[in-house]
A protein has these predicted regions:
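AMP-dependent adenylate-forming
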Residues: 8-15, 32-55
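Conserved AMP-binding/adenylate-forming core of the ANL superfamily
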Residues: 26, 43-82, 86-88, 95-96, ...
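Structural core segment of the AMP-binding/adenylate-forming
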Residues: 72-73, 100-192
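Conserved adenylate-forming
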Residues: 73-75, 197-209, 214-256, 268, ...
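AMP-binding/adenylate-forming catalytic core of the ANL superfamily
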Residues: 112, 129-131, 414, 419-420, ...
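Conserved AMP-binding/adenylation subdomain of ANL enzymes
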Residues: 235-254, 262-303, 317
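Gly/Ser/Thr-rich phosphate-binding loop
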Residues: 301-306, 317-377, 390
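Conserved ATP/PPi-binding loop(s) of AMP-dependent carboxylate-activating enzymes
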Residues: 384-388, 400-430, 468
Length: 536
């Protein structure tokens, strides 16, 4: 069978400024990649935090001081430091300070339970943990059962404008919590940790193959796993991003992203933005859409990076619709599907062709495919393989390439592909075969090299031997005029052991009443659109 992927049909769809491949990847560490911005635009705003502007000069200084603090705590190159924070200035200073000290960053969701937090701290072997004061009670339950020796406590109020800090405290609008000493563990406020520390650059050398990030993911199977991303993974991916977007000039852009640093998309895109000398609008609470709109109106971002659900909510807001989007170059959408019809509606507000759907994974730093910046964007497609990235679709059973237009598992090679999961040799053996990383995602490719995600392998529903992709069912349901959101799963078929039936949960649009008549109306619609075994 002909391997249609060997000829890389996507190359013909690359923008004119994008070469077929990259041959001159930088040989430097993640911390070294930041120096161009710190040295080149020191007076430019690096972060805007609820009205407080922090320059690249101050960012450089605070992150240097935190790196010195880590070394004072006995941290050495390769030691793991956990960041259990939302997007506040201290999180960014700490993240870059971790890299400057040669340590390994692991992002920890603030939504984790105490048990889940303990698991990640133990699995990663973290020596230092940064957390909020309002999460201290959760942390203290488990931190003594881990290798953590130092807990650095951050407040939402840190680095706020003085007036907002005072008013927020008086009106009790700033989440806070009491902290106290812990047995055999040093507990210190972030402000005290960096106070009086040297401001000069830390002299720590790390190699390209040394670990940079340990980001936790479900992987393709099983419990959360630490995906180890090297310095080269991150730095090479920055080069891929610059080449792909054509954004090369330092200090020209402003980026707004609601992705948290503990999520790999938020983590990498923040590193890329810092290295680009871009100003970042910190969106600490992504649910506060009115604040987001006010910040966008005042600070005029040129790039927005968010999940589809956030864009869906913004679309409903009068304040968002009233904004001037002429200066926004593109809206990146990733981490979950963005229904095609909704993209069309969104672009009626922000401008035709401005949504850039991307696809990736924690294990790939994260991007694998993206729609072109200036070329053809196919609505519903996650785009074409990024420059320097090889992608194939294979039969999960045989590993052989599938024909054009047929669904197959995405496998990938590239400088952004991680080296493996932390202490998980069996999972690594299962995920890497013949040099290709198997993603567990199913897609189709068209004749132009554009990829269309179909589903996760594990999310396929098996109905009497027929394979049903839940995302396909969701997309068709979402096209119904009465449906706002849909989610499809497979549940055991009580009449056929070993088989499943398709079940969908739907949210009706405002004004549509839930009733048996409405249910039957939707069922009839689905019977007209899909095969009988796919009808929920």
């Amino acid at each position: 069978m002909e391997d249609v992927y060997a000829s890389k049909p996507w190359l013909k769809s690359y923008d004119e400024h994008v070469p077929p491949t990259i041959t001159n990847y930088p040989q430097m560490s993640c911390a070294e990649a930041m120096r161009e911005a710190f040295d080149g635009v020191p007076d430019r705003m690096a972060l805007n935090y609820m009205g407080a502007n922090i320059s690249f000069r101050d960012f450089d200084t605070y992150s240097n001081q935190f790196a010195h603090f880590l070394i004072s705590q006995g941290c050495r190159a390769g030691d793991v430091v956990g960041l259990h924070l939302l997007n506040v200035p201290a999180a960014f200073f700490a993240a870059i300070g971790i890299h400057k000290a040669g340590c390994v960053f692991t992002g920890i969701s603030i939504l984790l339970s105490a048990e889940e937090l303990q698991y990640q701290l133990n699995d990663s072997g973290a020596k230092v943990l940064l957390t909020f004061d309002f999460n201290f009670e959760t942390v203290k339950k488990v931190v003594g059962k881990t290798k953590v020796k130092t807990v650095v406590v951050v407040s939402i109020a840190d680095f706020l404008p003085s007036i907002k800090k005072v008013l927020g405290t008086l009106l009790k609008k700033i989440p806070a919590g009491e902290i106290h000493s812990l047995p055999n563990i040093e507990v210190v406020r972030f402000s005290k940790a960096i106070e009086s520390r040297p401001k000069d650059i830390v002299n720590v050398k790390v190699g390209s193959d040394d670990p940079c990030l340990m980001m936790y993911t479900g992987g393709t199977t099983g419990p959360p796993k630490g995906a180890v991303l090297t310095q080269a993974n991150v730095v090479c991916h920055m080069k891929q991003m610059r080449t792909w977007t054509g954004l090369n000039n330092i200090g020209e852009h402003t980026i707004a992203s609601a992705f948290p640093l503990f999520h790999q998309a938020g983590n990498f895109l923040s590193l890329w933005a810092i290295a680009l000398g871009a100003s970042a609008i910190l969106l600490t609470n992504p649910r506060d859409l009115k604040f987001m709109c006010k910040a966008m109106k005042k600070l005029k971002p040129t790039v927005l990076i968010n999940v589809p659900t956030l864009y869906l909510e913004l679309m409903k807001m009068r304040e968002f619709k009233a904004l001037d989007f002429s200066g926004v170059q593109f809206f990146v959408s990733g981490a979950s599907p963005f229904p095609a019809e909704t993209i069309r509606d969104f672009e009626k507000i922000v401008g035709q062709g401005k949504v850039m759907e991307v696809y990736g994974m924690t294990e790939t730093t994260p991007l694998i495919t993206a729609n072109p910046m200036r070329g053809m964007k196919k609505v519903g497609s996650v785009g074409i393989p990024m420059v320097g990235t090889e992608v194939r679709l294979v039969d999960p059973a045989t590993g052989e390439p599938v024909p054009l237009g047929k669904p197959g598992e995405i496998v990938v090679k590239g400088p952004q592909v991680f080296k493996g999961y932390h202490h998980k040799p069996e999972e690594n053996a299962n995920s890497f075969r013949n040099g290709w990383f198997h993603t567990g995602d199913v897609a189709e490719m068209d004749e132009d090299g554009y990829f269309f995600i179909v589903d996760r392998l594990k999310d396929m529903v098996s109905v009497s031997g027929f394979k049903v992709f839940t995302r396909v069912v969701d997309d068709i349901l979402m096209e119904h005029i009465d449906i706002d959101m849909a989610a499809t799963i497979g549940i055991p078929d009580p009449k056929r052991p070993g088989s499943e039936i398709v079940a969908s949960a739907i949210k009706l649009k405002p004004g549509i009443e839930k009733s048996e008549a409405e249910r039957q109306k939707i069922l009839e619609y689905m019977k007209e659109r899909v095969a009988p075994y796919k009808v929920p």
